[in-house]
Design a protein with these regions (language model features):
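Bacterial N-terminal signal peptides
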Residues: 11-19
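Short, T/G/N/S-enriched strand-turn elements that build extracellular solenoid repeat scaffolds
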Residues: 65-73, 88-97, 111-113, 139-144, ...
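N-terminal extracellular ligand-recognition/capping segment immediately after the signal peptide
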Residues: 62-66, 76-131, 135-138, 158, ...
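Right-handed parallel beta-helix/beta-solenoid
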Residues: 30-65
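Short glycine/acidic-rich loop motifs that flank beta-strands on beta-rich extracellular proteins
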Residues: 88-92, 111-114, 162-166, 171-173, ...
């Protein structure tokens, strides 16, 4: 009798384990589901199409991509494949955790500063690494506990075009990251910057920027607009002004910038203000071409454990 009970117990445990494994596998499969975006695609299941004062032909592409990013947040992650074409983005698109975005050859993500919508104003950003559901909340993230495991890459020639947008008091930035970890940006051309940066990197850990090109600018008043800006979320310096941060002055840690081209810019990479005793650490820049930058190549303010390898610097413009 004892032997039968033991066999039954082992069998029950085995069946339960198999059920749990199957459940986990299904959950992982669901999280990794792929969705394809095209220039003419409507929002997921018609979401936002009846939003009067918001949805129109100018905002359609924005709401289409936004609806799928919101879907991926609910599903715990997944992949967006963005097909060839031009996508005009008037407002910020928030990217949640465990998301991969593949930009196909011929994709242009273009910043526009108009909506033609009565209830919706344009904003200066394009992408931000933050859960869409937390976009309007205050102080939700600190340290490196925000959105994680994000990859944005191109399989060919894809462009994020800031179109020289922005003005005093309203920076235009292609990608904002803060309180993030495990982020990869690869194979993308960023172009046409004014009043801002291409990448604003604050309080982020384990970031890899590889095989990207950063090019083109119109002069800002301060002449220190870096293509990639390393900063801290600090209320005193106001280097980061997004309310969802806890403003804990967390620096960046373990950043690798490799095989990139920086040309015709004010500055390639750097930090132009700092938080006291908060050091960006383990910063590696290798095999990059830096040319024609007005205010210099790399500014290492409050950096520790820095590695510069095989950089090539060419002719500097004078402002």
């Amino acid at each position: 009798m004892k032997k039968r009970k033991l066999v039954f117990a082992i069998t029950a445990i085995t069946v339960f384990s198999a059920m749990m494994l199957t459940s986990n596998t299904k959950a992982q499969a669901a999280a990794k589901k792929t969705y394809t975006i095209t220039p003419k695609l409507s929002p997921y299941k018609g979401k936002y199409k009846k939003a009067k004062g918001y949805y129109n032909s100018t905002t359609k592409q924005y709401f289409a991509i936004r609806s799928y990013l919101e879907l991926l947040e609910k599903k715990g992650g997944g992949k967006l494949v963005i097909k060839k074409g031009t996508y005009k983005i008037p407002n910020v698109l928030y990217i949640p955790s465990n998301v991969t975005i593949e930009l196909k050859d011929g994709v242009t993500i273009k910043k526009i500063m108009k909506t033609k919508a009565k209830k919706m104003k344009p904003s200066g950003g394009i992408f931000e690494l933050l859960e869409p559901s937390k976009a309007k909340k205050k102080g939700v993230h600190g340290q490196y506990n925000g959105v994680h495991d994000v990859k944005i890459y191109s399989t060919g020639k894809a462009v994020i075009d800031q179109d020289y947008q922005g003005k005093t008091g309203q920076n235009c930035i292609a990608l904002v990251m803060c309180h993030n970890r495990n982020v990869t940006i690869e194979g993308i051309t960023f172009k046409n910057m004014k009043y801002g940066h291409f990448i604003e990197m604050d309080a982020s850990q384990n970031v890899n920027v590889n095989r990207c090109t950063f090019t083109g600018y119109k002069a800002s008043k301060r002449h220190t607009s870096e293509a990639i800006n390393l900063d801290t979320p600090d209320k005193k310096t106001r280097g980061f002004t997004h309310g969802w941060s806890q403003y804990d002055c967390t620096p960046n840690q373990n950043v690798q910038i490799t095989n990139c081209i920086f040309s015709n810019l004010e500055k390639a990479i750097g930090t132009h203000q700092y938080s006291v005793e908060k050091y960006h650490t383990d910063i590696s820049i290798s095999d990059c071409m830096i040319k024609n930058c007005v205010s210099g190549g790399i500014e290492m303010m409050n950096w520790q454990r820095v590695s510069l390898t095989n950089e090539i610097y060419e002719y500097w413009k004078k402002q």
